[in-house]
Amino acid sequence: MTLTITAQTISITSIEQLNELSGENVKLCMQCATCTGMCPMTAEMDLSPRMVMHLAQFGMLDRLGDSNTCWKCASCHACTVKCPRGIDIAKVMEALRQHVLRTNKNYIEPSALPAERIAELPQIALVAAFRKLTS
C-alpha cells in the first residue's frame, strides 16, 4: 500500500480525538510490529495492527474507518500484553469503532438477519455484535 503523507493529510484534531477516546497516546508507538506478530486475526484484516497505529499517528481516521481491521479485532489484548511501549492497542481499535459509529455508519442491519439464524445464535453473541457493529 502506497501512503503519501503531506502537511494537509495530518490531522492533529483527529489524533487528539483518538487519544481521548482510547485513553492512549498513539504517538508512543515505535512501529516495531510486535502487535501484528501477536494478533491472531491479522490474516483476516486488510490493514495490520502496526499499519493502523501508523495511520493513527497521522490522524488518518477516515482511511482507518474504511478499513475492516477495527471490526475484525477480537479484543483479545495479545497485542497489548507484548507491546514494548505499553500501548493498549485493543483500546485504540475500540476507539476507532466508536469514531466510525459516531458517524452513524452501521456495519450490520439487525432486520436483515434471517429469523432462523437469529433463533440459533446465542443471545450474548447477538448483543455483542449489535453493540459493536451498529450506531
Per-segment meaning from a language model:
Residues 113-135:
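Acidic/histidine-enriched, glycine/proline-rich intrinsically disordered or flexible terminal extensions
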Residues 4-21, 44-70, 76, 89-121:
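Ferredoxin-type iron-sulfur electron-transfer modules in oxidoreductases and energy-metabolism complexes
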Residues 9, 39, 78, 130-135:
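Short histidine
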Residues 81-97, 128-135:
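A broadly tuned preference for mixed-charge, low-complexity surface segments
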Residues 25-42, 67-87:
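Cysteine-centered iron-sulfur cluster-binding motifs in ferredoxin-type domains/subunits
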